[in-house]
């Protein structure tokens, strides 16, 4: 192994893709149990490695030198082999500092809460101290060494909330370390989780009009800092933004909403082909799981039960996917929960096809006649507009709509 990352569980790491964009060097992912880590360090058969949870502290006794920032934090995420000497660094400090600045937060002279008490929490404490936070409090399920409980945290005032726990991380997408509504003084929220692209707590915070950000930019910046140690040469600062945008776009889903018969499935398949992405149709996933057509499910269960089924399928089968094109059912927009789930990794495009270009069909229970279609259009149109990231006029040909979505997504 020339360069790479070691950790216990790394099936969904973004690091290889990021390092491919940084430079022309091989970067390997190696999962291993704790007992295998010492042998890797003793053998020293690498030029440089990143170290991820839960080994950032475990590696430290095996290093010949640890830089001051890593020693202050108490953990190492980058190890470089310099002529047989292992030197440890913590580039998470660089990444988290950049992430806090990116969200627009200024912790100077203000109180902050850190949720979690692991290695990343120690990094957050060091970063917030360097940025001048007036009071830094750790929140833990098992409070000790000055940490407080989650119940006590809800009584504290804080301008910046930093989540360092794995709450909300794939595949546990519907979890959150805290409810931002319980922290009315919060000016910003930083969540170090990077998968999904928008965690539950970040979406909840943004819905309140408060700046919030997940950890992908931190991951990119710390990777660049690690690469500079690996290669002993600087990476131009502008590369961070370019790499961040490339990785985010490659992972982000294109989610299509709109009325029945507006062309979501047809456009979605053509778009997926054009972009070489997998395609998923929410209605097809429902039918596949249920073993019955949607019209039969409506007739047997009623609309309320069908909507429950639809949300369950979105949560279980679609929300965690990345780099896909997803066509939703016409009524998926009715539930805000569906939109939140789909936004975790997706950007939502409303295919706005004029009412006179829509066609009622018997296989669409809520739009089986011209009158029913008109009623649905009038009821749902405001929701389609409110619950999308971009409205795409869809009165033209499939090719024209595909081009419009593609251009909007890549802009």
Protein language model regions, located:
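Phosphate/diphosphate ligand-binding glycine-rich loop within oxidoreductases
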Residues: 2-103, 196-198, 202-204, 208-220
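Rossmann-like adenosine-cofactor binding region
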Residues: 146-212, 332-338
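A glycine- and Lys/Arg-enriched "phosphate-lid" helix/loop adjacent to the NTP-binding pocket
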Residues: 344-383, 390
């Amino acid at each position: 192994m020339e360069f790479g990352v070691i950790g216990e569980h790394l099936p969904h790491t973004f690091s290889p893709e990021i390092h491919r964009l940084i430079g022309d060097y091989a970067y390997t992912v190696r999962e291993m149990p704790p007992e295998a880590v010492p042998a890797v360090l003793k053998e020293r058969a690498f030029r440089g490695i990143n170290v991820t949870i839960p080994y950032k502290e475990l590696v430290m006794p095996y290093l010949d030198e640890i830089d001051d920032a890593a020693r202050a934090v108490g953990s190492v995420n980058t190890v470089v082999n310099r002529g047989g000497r292992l030197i440890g660094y913590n580039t998470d400090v660089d990444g988290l500092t950049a992430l806090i600045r990116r969200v627009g937060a200024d912790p100077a002279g203000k109180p902050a809460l850190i949720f979690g008490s692991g290695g990343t929490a120690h990094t957050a404490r060091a970063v917030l101290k360097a940025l001048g936070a007036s009071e830094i409090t750790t929140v833990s399920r098992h409070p000790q060494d000055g940490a407080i409980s989650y119940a006590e945290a809800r009584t504290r005032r804080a301008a910046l909330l930093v989540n360092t726990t794995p709450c909300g991380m794939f595949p546990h997408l519907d979890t959150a370390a805290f409810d931002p509504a319980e922290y009315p003084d919060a000016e910003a929220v930083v969540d170090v989780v990077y998968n999904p692209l928008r965690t539950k707590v970040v979406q909840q915070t943004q819905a309140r009009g408060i700046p919030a950000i997940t950890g992908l930019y931190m991951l990119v910046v710390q990777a660049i800092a690690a690469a500079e140690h690996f290669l002993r040469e600087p990476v131009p600062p502008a590369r961070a933004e370019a790499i961040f945008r490339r990785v985010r776009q490659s992972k982000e889903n294109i989610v299509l909403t709109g009325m029945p018969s507006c062309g979501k499935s047809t456009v979605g398949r053509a778009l997926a082909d054009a972009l070489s992405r997998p395609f998923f149709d929410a209605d097809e996933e429902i039918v596949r799981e249920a073993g019955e057509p949607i019209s039969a499910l409506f007739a047997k269960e009623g609309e309320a039960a069908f909507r429950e089924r639809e949300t369950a399928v979105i949560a279980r089968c679609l929300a965690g996917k990345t780099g896909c094109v997803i066509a939703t059912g016409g009524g998926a927009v009715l539930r805000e929960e569906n939109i939140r789930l789909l936004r975790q990794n997706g950007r939502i495009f409303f295919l706005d096809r004029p009412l006179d270009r829509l066609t009622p069909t018997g296989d669409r229970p809520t739009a089986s006649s011209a009158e029913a279609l008109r009623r649905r259009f009038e009821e749902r149109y405001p929701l389609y507009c409110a619950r999308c990231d971009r409205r795409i006029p869809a009165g033209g040909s499939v090719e024209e709509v595909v081009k419009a979505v593609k251009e909007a997504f890549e802009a």
